[in-house]
Each structure stands twice: as C-alpha cells, then as structure tokens.
C-alpha cells in the first residue's frame, strides 16, 4: 500500500522573495511531495515543487506499479489518471467529490452495526467533465459512504470491487501515517529554519533531511534495532566525530574485538 500526499513548506520574509511568484492562498514557499510505503514505513519517492503545482500533476509523473494500492485525497482527483492506474492493474482508494456526476449501477447490503452507510457500484455519467476533455474512465467503480462522528459522511471511491468495505475505509484512514511522517521530519530534522534563503539552498536542505532520515532508517533496519528512530538520530548527532561508536548499537550482539574495545576505551 502506497500513500500519496504533499505538505507545504512556508517561506516568508526577507530573502524569500523568489517564493512569491508561485504562491497560493495556502502556502508561499515550496511543496514537498511524498509517496509513502505503509509496509516499509518509509518514503519511496520524493519531489519538490512550487505550491501552485497540482498534486495530481505530480502523481502523473510517478510510475504506477502493478498490484499496488494507492491511497490519496481529493487533491489527486483526475479521472483519466485513475483510469491509467486501473489499466496498469493497480488499485486506488480516494475521496469522491460531492458534485461528481455518477449513475448507480448496483447497491450492496450493509450491516446496521457497521460504520458503512452505503456501498455500491457506479459509472461516471459525465463523458466530458472538464470543459470538453473526454473522461476515459468508463468501467465500473465503487462508491462507499462511511459514517463519521460530528461530520458529514466520508464518500470514498475505489476500483477495489470485491474487498470488504470496512477494509477499504481502513485503508483510507491509514493515509494519516504520511501526515505523521511529515510532522516527524519537520520537527526532528529541523526543516522549519534554513541555513540559506535561496531556492537552491532551501531545496538542498530539504533533500538532505530526507536523505538523513533514510540513512538512519536503513541503519536501524539492517541491524534489527528496536531503538526508536528519533533516539538513534539524536545519538548520531551527538557522536558525528566518533564514527567508531556506531558499533555501540550492536556490540552486545557480537563479540567485541580487542581493537574495537581499545578504540572505545581511548576515544570516549
């Protein structure tokens, strides 16, 4: 399962004048796009753009892999792109716009005790939804209405026609994992303050932060560590000038050689 989303990087004030030309009401700066693998708990693709670059346009630039389930929000609403996902034997789960023109083909029974309010198959009834642009998605799709506390029902759309509706709702709920990732890197890797103010300087610092995350993540997984990623990051920051101390993470699992023991005793 892969989750697609973006997060704004606000850049305002003296030195960031270059960011004003492509600003939106929501953001003046850059936008960080990420494809996040829920199984690996790690990003698989990362890109930067200006805020006025649509999320769906970035999604179109990334390759679609067979048998992968892609989860994304309404920012990626593009019927033709959804069709390309379907054609490549991949799957998607997203939100359906309230004003989407559809015709219901079949309704499924729902359990009274389930949060699933409605479940059924439909077709898009508008052949040209965007000012004359032909809608390529002509196959059946699935519409699921999910109850939410103190909010309007969540309307989901997917090409997973046979899976339980509850599972599909849970897949969309798991999209928040990528929000936690964005929050983690912004807080832990200090990408709210930048060393330089030029466009290249900001982009380099952002990409460097992602690389740092991936390196620590790979180190943690390759050594079967249970230490939280943040604690490992702090430990590494405090010992950048003592590379031999990286062995401290797994010295208890291997016999300590006399050379390593000597270095640890003399360099710490």
Q: Which residues make up each language-model segment?
A:
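Single, function-defining residue in the core of a domain
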Residues: 1-268
């Amino acid at each position: 399962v892969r989750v697609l989303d973006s997060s704004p990087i606000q850049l305002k004030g003296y030195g960031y004048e270059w960011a004003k030309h492509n600003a939106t009401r929501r953001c003046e700066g850059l936008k960080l796009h990420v494809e996040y693998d829920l199984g690996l708990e790690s990003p698989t693709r990362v890109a930067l753009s200006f805020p006025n670059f649509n999320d769906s346009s970035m999604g179109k630039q990334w390759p679609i892999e067979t048998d992968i389930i892609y989860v994304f929000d309404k920012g990626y609403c593009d019927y033709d792109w959804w069709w390309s996902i379907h054609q490549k034997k991949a799957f998607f789960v997203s939100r359906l716009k309230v004003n989407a023109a559809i015709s219901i083909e079949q309704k499924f029974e729902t359990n009274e005790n389930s949060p699933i309010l409605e479940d059924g198959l439909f077709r898009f009834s508008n052949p040209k939804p965007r000012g004359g642009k032909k809608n390529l998605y002509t196959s059946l799709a699935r519409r699921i209405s999910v109850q939410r506390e103190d909010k309007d029902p969540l309307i989901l759309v997917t090409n997973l026609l046979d899976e339980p509706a509850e599972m599909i709702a849970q897949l969309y709920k798991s999209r928040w994992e990528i929000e936690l990732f964005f929050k983690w890197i912004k807080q832990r890797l200090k990408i709210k303050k930048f060393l330089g103010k030029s466009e290249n300087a900001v982009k380099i610092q952002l990409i460097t932060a992602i690389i740092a995350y991936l390196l620590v993540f790979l180190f943690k997984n390759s050594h079967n560590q249970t230490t939280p990623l943040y604690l490992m990051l702090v430990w590494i920051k405090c010992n950048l000038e003592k590379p031999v101390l990286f062995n401290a993470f797994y010295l208890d699992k291997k016999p300590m050689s006399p050379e390593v023991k000597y270095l640890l005793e003399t360099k710490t």
